[in-house]
């Protein structure tokens, strides 16, 4: 083995502890599913009710930081000495594909039902005001605010990697300017990295927990094969195999091709919904929802509902902000990797504009379609959920479109590829973060990437065995708590170091 290859091997102190911790959590969960569900409910209630305000302030402050980067002294600073590695179109496609999975199709199709049936601000369920604010809240949760937080951290990691030429891509490695090299190389740095890795593994497991039932329900619809946990496991195994094939071709070929195919197919499917799902209504509903969003945004930003205690901000806003927090470092590391050579302003504006457009299109088309099906009494969503579960209800919203078989084939392929691209990005970052060192332009070991994707698949199966959305939401909330503090430290470390090395 060459010296370089040896150097790129795994780092035991950040590779084995997460494996052990996650293994213990899996064992305890499988050992008693009922007791695990009780713990899950208690954790979710405590974090969202006691600490929900912190997640809301975090998102607001990071959004303000995005404006500082775009219009401040660092706006024209370039992240690296070379030209951009990818074309602008492929760059945006890769960002969108890596940051979203079939979970986007999951929430995009059913989220509006929850918002209009149990709306915020004391509104009556299924009323006109509830329907008006339904899509507006989706645009809020999946709009410029969270993407801006990703772009800020992406700039931070790109700065440390391409400007400061750091070889190790782990959260702790960026904290030297803030806490000193002694603490980074000691117990403090190890704890930070292990928190990050455990949380990320849980987050990836939740994404699989959302995506897998959609695919298996598609299979049941198309082929008549019953949806079972065994079928879920087979689907997850197929994803892991495809991930291995993609990474074998390297980042440039494998991820780029998968991302491009997925993005073009997304446009095709959304175009189909737009054409046959009522184009006039969808455009009008989106336009009205943007106005509603602008009108209610100050309230949405700080809504904790301590008086009414309806639970809406805890169940949705805090949950989603924790979702964004838990994925922030992992996604930002990957986004920084593919943004070499771009300016700070280009990265921030490209990410927020491109990714907001993508998520808004998905939520507008799929959510608008679901609302029409409810209004026209074509589907009884509550009955479908009670009898068959949420995934079946989502499938029925797409199957209700004309040419249902062709539509379901497209939806099936899109869900499948979408999750492959997410696993690609996550396994790449996990492998990179558990290596001893990564030189600029190097790729993490293939077997390590595949190994991480296998572990994440196991987590997904366990969450599916628990059943329901609450275990998935709680895994996100619990993992988001420690990373909340890690994200803040990375941000402060970047600001402190940039003042010294990025002078005007």
Curated annotation (Swiss-Prot):
Record keywords, A-Z: Antiport, Cell inner membrane, Cell membrane, Membrane, Transmembrane, Transmembrane helix, Transport
PROSITE patterns hit by this protein: BCCT
Alphabetical GO biological process terms: 4-(trimethylammonio)butanoate transport; carnitine metabolic process
A GO term from the CC aspect: plasma membrane
Localization per Swiss-Prot or TrEMBL: Cell inner membrane
Membrane topology designation: Multi-pass membrane protein
The reaction(s) this protein catalyses: 4-(trimethylamino)butanoate(in) + (R)-carnitine(out) = 4-(trimethylamino)butanoate(out) + (R)-carnitine(in)
Signal peptide: none
Pfam families from the UniProt entry: BCCT (PF02028)
Transmembrane parts of this sequence: 8-28, 51-71, 92-112, 143-163, 195-215, 231-251, 263-283, 315-335, 347-367, 403-423, 446-466, 475-495
Molecular function GO terms recorded: (R)-carnitine:4-(trimethylammonio)butanoate antiporter activity
Pathway given in the UniProt record: Amine and polyamine metabolism; carnitine metabolism
Xref: HAMAP family: CaiT
Membership in a protein family: Belongs to the BCCT transporter (TC 2.A.15) family. CaiT subfamily.
Subunit-level organization: Homotrimer.
Role of this protein: Catalyzes the exchange of L-carnitine for gamma-butyrobetaine.
Annotated protein name in UniProt: L-carnitine/gamma-butyrobetaine antiporter
Gene encoding the protein: caiT
